[in-house]
Amino acid sequence: MPLLKLDQVVIKDLGKKQYQETFSAMKDFVAKGEDESIWMLEHDPVFTLGTAADQKHILKRTDIDIFQADRGGEVTYHGPGQLVIYFLLNIKKRNLGPKKFVKQLEDLVQKTLLNFQIQSNTIEGSPGVYVDSKKIASIGLRFSKGYSYHGISINVDMDLDPFKNINPCGYEGLQVTQIKDIYSNITLEKVKSVVEKNIQQIF
């Protein structure tokens, strides 16, 4: 059974964008309440704080910008080599509750990882996708006037060192991983292609 149909939803590849610029664009898009879209992109290095974020989970201050976002969740890191996918969807029209939507996004990530022979799992109460207890994909969402925005980030082929400066998603000692460490012959473009195909098949 398909998770949901994405009739007339445009999937856009935005390349590399500053987080703050994209954050403003998302809010403007959703405020109009007219269309739906899915954006795929990379961000320049940035730590983002969710609405539940506690500053104590920033372990070391660096020259990487810190931005307070309005998504759910704690602190995370975005940077080049990580695929970020924002889902700007009318979930009210699609009759999707937050829990069901999160489950569908996790399913999308897991299906994508399987394309690269990577087995993964989810953890009840801790949204995201894990490989051998290491987090490979994060989920953070916001819902406003029946729309979703923000989305998921998948670690593909990136510098993971900045994660050492935080407790990722608010969990002390949580380790992170990426596709490159498990499936060496990988590029961001390959993952984008698989994600887009899976969106068309699953959603």
Report the location of each language-model feature.
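A general nucleic-acid interaction/assembly signal
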Residues: 143-144
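Conserved phosphate/anionic-ligand binding catalytic regions in large, soluble enzymes, centered on
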Residues: 147-155
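Short conserved catalytic/interaction loops centered on acidic-Pro-aromatic/His motifs
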Residues: 120-123, 150, 161-166
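N-terminal lobe of the biotin/lipoate ligase/transferase fold
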Residues: 1-136, 185-189
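Short, functional N-terminal and low-complexity linear motifs
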Residues: 73-79, 159-166
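Conserved, well-ordered active-site substructure
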Residues: 140
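C-terminal accessory segment of soluble enzyme catalytic cores
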Residues: 160-203
